[in-house]
């Protein structure tokens, strides 16, 4: 169940891989480097279909798309790589121009996580992020639990605790293509429905530049299912080359916040979450990212559905009721479930 590769990660040690299989033959694979979700093969019409974008294990340190990685300490962007915490200004490591993206140059995706335990249907990884890591305050202990169910669901649970107040926002950066992630099909031909009434406008650098807006009469209205391509790159999407925006999830944990359906409707993905927001990214800059088969992905080859809090929340007290600032000694816990049908 736990396999070591013949080649080494940047720390000089082999990658460790874990594969899980359910009673239907669905298989998922994970890696300790970045606590990464490597592969997801779902039974469709008697065959296994790869629905997760990925590359060769040895190529993961060199790709910049965060394929399937656990992202932290703060997923998404923090403007100008700084924010106020109490009476202090916290200065972070910038890694996207003057901003910080996904936790900095050495975020959680670039760390060796410890395999704490694994079984037939689960694996749990842990990581210690020290005080000062990428500029963030506090020693943070993080755990992620991946579980594969016999209902063809993958559940991801993040748990953390810090000894100081800190910014904290964890997510998984998987890219999905239900038609077949190996063939490079354009994900814009999928149908998408979002249980979301509000979205967050951003500028060309992905930094919020407006209060939350209602989706009515905009290209961000997915309350009724529509092809992703239908209103693509209209209006505010022009500066981001497509969808790369956060939506506030209408709170009903027992109901999916996402329904993604393949073009011929032979496979769908429902997403349920305890998180307040969802970042929808249509792979606008995937071109050149390595595949598993010695090729490269094109733009729009997959869609990331990143459950999280809002970007740049540490600089926006008005959004902190959605999460983003973790108090010392308090338990951080959130879950997301991906259901394939």
Please annotate each region the language model reported:
Residues 1-341:
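An exposed, glycine/acidic-rich loop-and-rim segment of catalytic or binding clefts
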